[in-house]
Amino acid sequence: MTAASQAERTVLEEEFNWLLKEEVHAVLKQLQDILKEASRRLSMPSPGLEGQLKQENFILGSSTMDQVKGVLTLQGEALTQADINIKVAKSSQVMHFAFRDDKQWKLQQIQDARNHVNQALQLLSSRDDSYHFKTGAEVNKLMDAIMLQLTRARNRLTTPASMTLPELAASGLMKMFTPPMPGDVMVNFYINLSKLCLTVYQLHVLQPNTTKNFKPAGSSVLHNPGAMFEHNNTKFEVSHVHKVECVVPWLNDTLVFFTISLQLCQQLKDKISVFSSFWNYRPF
């Protein structure tokens, strides 16, 4: 090895040690600050402190139809109030439903996303300023674990859960309303990216003599007209589907925080891989 290459190697090792000692912790601090903001936006009110988390009203609408209108009240992960008007397709009669006073509906997607963010924060807090990273592999392992939690958190907000129509019919959501939902109407709430969505299904009962072509629909986020299912020994077909939605600004903020955090993790991994490429062997 020449003196020049030895000197270069010494400089690289010093830079790499500085990366492990200083820059890694600077990135971890950045990640912690960003994810604390994300967690705060996704947080639920503490018992007895519900007033600290503000209630927000959102008007549901669609640019193409007016069969369904609604106002939802969201407090963290909980839908605390819902006021829905549904125009019946056949008669143009308007049905009105609201949440019972003793009921609120937890949005599992927000709850799950918050849990993943908090797991990422726990990983970060396990490596405080006093911790000394000894190898690049150790940093990469931590970044991979954090990125896994953040990807799962993001996926919960971007990918609503699929449900079968019988699952929806048996859901506790159907028991939330006053007056009670009639047997030929079903609703579903879910998050899609930064939007809070309401889907309303209007159904008709299939007569026994018309069920020879009965083909139950599978699991889906959004079922189409014509989808069939059986519930409580009665066969139904979806006759009309109405979807309305509204943008929730803090969900959009949260998704941006996830993107920035994932980029920070990847950039740190990239820096470590650049150092490793300077050596003929893997020094970390």
UniProtKB/Swiss-Prot annotation:
Regions crossing the membrane: none
Entry keywords, A to Z: Cell projection, Cytoplasmic vesicle, Nucleus, Synapse
Origin: domain of life: Eukaryota
GO cellular component: axon; dendrite; nuclear envelope; perikaryon; RAVE complex; synaptic vesicle
Localization per record: Nucleus envelope; Presynapse; Cell projection, Axon; Perikaryon
Pfam family, one: Rogdi_lz
InterPro entries: RAVE2/Rogdi
Family: Belongs to the rogdi family.
Name the UniProt record assigns to this protein: Protein rogdi homolog
Source organism (scientific name): Danio rerio (Zebrafish)
